[in-house]
From Swiss-Prot:
This is Small ribosomal subunit protein uS14. InterPro entries: Ribosomal_uS14, Ribosomal_uS14_arc, Ribosomal_uS14_CS, RIbosomal_uS14_euk_arc, Ribosomal_uS14_sf. Binds 1 zinc ion per subunit. It comes from the Archaea. GO terms for molecular function: rRNA binding; structural constituent of ribosome; zinc ion binding. Belongs to the universal ribosomal protein uS14 family. Zinc-binding uS14 subfamily. Its cofactor is Zn(2+). GO terms for cellular component: cytosolic small ribosomal subunit. GO terms for biological process: cytoplasmic translation. It comes from Halobacterium salinarum (strain ATCC 700922 / JCM 11081 / NRC-1). Binds 16S rRNA, required for the assembly of 30S particles. The keyword Ribosomal protein applies.
Amino acid sequence: MSETDGEAEETGQTHECRRCGREQGLVGKYDIWLCRQCFREIARSMGFKKYS
């Protein structure tokens, strides 16, 4: 049984970027829910460190 967009919204399983609203390329680990572009912009201010 395939799930349509309408069904996913009803069950609350769709996620979007908290900052810009984009639905693709989400970083959901640790319930961050930011798209990868927004994550790259604000990761340092969230306490993440970049190694090499």
